[in-house]
């Protein structure tokens, strides 16, 4: 196990994207969509070698003839057969490694059901025959990646947003808040408000175009009302975007109305609190003695925190909720899109971590429930 040339594999399975690579690297080698596609129609050409399923980018590029499924919904695995296909694709096609030769570090959503952790463990040892594995909570890894062990992580990806207070490396489960509002919802909302402007985006293929518009042009306003005023009186906030067919569309207040839904979920017809309130509520559920450390170490993580302006807005909103003299610091690392993976890479390469792995032998002796004793 202590062999230097046997690098651990780090796999961060998100609702939208899977990030995978080798421990010790500073970025994931493979980043691909967490999708499995199956042909909608029977193949008519004999001997074309049509496959019964496609994964990731290949599924994405053939989406016109496939039915696409996301096996991870709101951060939690709901379809294990498809999940197995994604892992198989990760090891054999993307990383080109034999999983039976490397320890594997997987990530999980906060509050992941116990049965799910056991199932992950079982698949790794029984299907892929890994020599060792470990399951780490995503938000905790993001915090490690920022060089901290105490703080509150606002982790927002494609399928779910969590606010996770962490003290000395341990997530505090009673104070974790989950918000089913993330990147996919913002893309859908942008599709809806662009339709109001007279542009029609409806298919799954067009949704990808809108996702690109969102990633390239959207930003978070510091003062929403004031920004709306500016947008209505001048064209200074308008930007144009060229569609794949050459048509150019103009987008104005949609640029900041879309991510505003994170602060005002009522825009999406949701009754929940915005991410700033969720963060505050999480902090208030923690022991009074550690709140100061959480306010001063508020870390953003995940692709849906990549909007320009989000850190300043977060600072403003939390300052308004917190006690007046409180020092509030929002940390927004530039690589936060991949900070869960980076944290995993750091953790799996620490010498002190090597005794933490669940070995095949321990699994054979105790069964899948070993994961609750060794990973927390």
Swiss-Prot record:
EC number: 3.6.4.-
N-acetylaspartate: modified positions: 3
Catalytic activity: ATP + H2O = ADP + phosphate + H(+)
Modified residues (N6-methyllysine): 85
Disulfide bond residue pairs: none
SUPFAM superfamilies associated with the record: Actin-like ATPase domain (SSF53067)
A GO term, aspect molecular function: ATP binding
Residues annotated with Tele-methylhistidine modification: 74
Enzyme class: hydrolase
Modified residues (Methionine (R)-sulfoxide): 45, 48
Role: Actins are highly conserved proteins that are involved in various types of cell motility and are ubiquitously expressed in all eukaryotic cells.
PANTHER family: ACTIN
Protein's name according to its UniProt entry: Actin, cytoplasmic
Organism expressing this protein natively: Planorbella trivolvis
Species classification: Eukaryota, Metazoa, Spiralia, Lophotrochozoa, Mollusca
